[in-house]
């Protein structure tokens, strides 16, 4: 079964000093979750907007549209998501690709640190699913894949951290208009 990726709109007001995101823990799988989870071994975790407690927010991915946030919000959100570096807890969602991309390999789950990068793509790129159709990192050859941790994930985070400095200097609006690639020259790319 292929999960349809649908953006939904949440009206979210951020108070200064509060986090944009939270991590929910799922210890028990309800019947509506069965097709979403990567295996039968909870706990699972999900990065969500702090103000979203809906079941729908757990099922659709990503749970928001970038059009609702200012460039200043997007900059703060990216900074916060980069703090998930090293978080290898298993994401609630199993690996699922969007568009025409299909993945039939053995990997079924990904870590919160990979999810954080994937969410960054969804708030930065207008068509994030063309840039990163599924939460799998690969080397330039496409032969080696990473979804949890390791050298490729570390390289990806280093590239995103450098990219973040670059896009802040450019201005988030200008960088988004130019669709500046976070992984350019890193030796890592998103699986397509």
Identify the residue ranges that each predicted region occupies.
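Bacterial Sec-dependent N-terminal signal peptides
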Residues: 1-25
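Extended repeat-based scaffolds of very large eukaryotic assembly and lipid-transport proteins
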Residues: 16-192
């Amino acid at each position: 079964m292929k999960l349809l990726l649908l953006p939904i709109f949440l009206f979210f007001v951020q108070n200064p000093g509060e986090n944009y995101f939270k991590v929910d823990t799922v210890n028990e799988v309800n019947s509506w979750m069965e097709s979403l989870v990567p295996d039968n071994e909870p706990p699972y975790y999900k990065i969500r907007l702090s103000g979203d407690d809906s079941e729908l927010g757990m099922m659709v991915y990503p749970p928001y549209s970038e059009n609702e946030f200012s460039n200043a919000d997007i900059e703060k959100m990216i900074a916060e998501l980069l703090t998930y570096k090293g978080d290898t807890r298993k994401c609630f969602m199993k690996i699922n690709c969007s568009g025409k991309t299909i993945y039939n390999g053995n990997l079924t789950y990904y870590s919160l640190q990979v999810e954080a990068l994937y969410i960054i793509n969804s708030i930065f790129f207008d068509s994030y699913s063309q840039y990163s159709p599924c939460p799998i990192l690969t080397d330039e050859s496409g032969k080696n894949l990473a979804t949890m941790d390791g050298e490729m994930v570390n390289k990806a985070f280093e590239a995103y951290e450098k990219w973040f400095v670059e896009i802040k200097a450019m201005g988030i609006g200008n960088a988004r208009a130019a669709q500046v690639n976070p992984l350019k020259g890193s030796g890592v790319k998103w699986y397509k």
